[in-house]
């Protein structure tokens, strides 16, 4: 890592992004204002059944990353603690309520056990996005309902194009 990269304030915003929602987008937007570099990273979790392929999730992440000069879309197949440490970055997680908070707090402790340098910043979701989740969006998509209110515009266009191809 060069000296410039070491001085930058960097953050990793990890997820499966199946799909990326307006809530994720808001966290990215807010993180991009705070950090010099944000890694919007699709983490591969082989135990998780996804609606969208890794390629599709990566494409959606890149559409959002392209909107911000300091956000980079990425894919990782490793431990989050190792990924963050390699980039000298903090982990940012959005939390919608106490259930998310408790879950993410426990994960932050586990990440610290893996790598003591791993810090996690929990960012509260804005009230208007508290009920939005990828699970909810997937359910709407299964029934061919409009999801444009729940995903960023670029992701909405992507999903519409994908639906037209099917």
Q: How would you name each of these model-derived features?
A:
Residues 1-166:
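Nucleotidyltransferase catalytic core that binds NTPs
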